[in-house]
């Protein structure tokens, strides 16, 4: 009887933790999503990849609060998993709440080391608050960068 009570308690005490963490993506999942986009880009080319990324039904590039975006190194959005209305817009001068140039920072990572993390503040659609976010960025081909952001928990 004690064993059953212990197992029930252990199961119930872990469930809320799992539910709380499963609603947000992780850094490892963000990196994996960028790698999937890179693989598709190399295999299928830019047009097919950008179309797949911008399709909200495509679960390879959309998972909970994670989504892929791709910009040219000049700052023009060419694919966006959360806001397709941004496609075609030059956002090189967009700033976060603290006045940091968001897309410029992504471009610097892509042109410099070729991959890395960019930190900024951004609206979280799940909480409707401005929150700390970090995005994993990689240069994609010669002309683009690809990224996926994670809200810091």
Stretch-by-stretch model annotation:
Residues 2-153:
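N-terminal membrane-sensor/transducer module of prokaryotic signaling receptors
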């Amino acid at each position: 009887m004690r064993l059953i009570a212990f197992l029930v308690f252990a199961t119930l005490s872990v469930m809320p933790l799992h539910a709380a963490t499963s609603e947000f993506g992780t850094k490892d999942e963000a990196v994996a999503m960028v790698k999937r986009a890179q693989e598709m880009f190399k295999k299928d080319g830019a047009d097919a990849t950008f179309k797949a990324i911008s399709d909200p039904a495509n679960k390879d590039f959309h998972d909970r609060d994670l989504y892929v975006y791709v910009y040219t190194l000049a700052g023009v959005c060419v694919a966006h998993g959360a806001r397709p209305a941004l496609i075609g817009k030059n956002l090189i001068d967009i700033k976060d709440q603290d006045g940091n140039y968001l897309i410029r920072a992504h471009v610097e990572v892509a042109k410099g080391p070729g991959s890395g993390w960019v930190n900024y503040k951004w609206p979280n659609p799940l909480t409707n608050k401005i929150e700390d976010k970090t995005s994993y960025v990689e240069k994609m081909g010669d002309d683009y960068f690809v990224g996926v952001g994670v809200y810091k928990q």
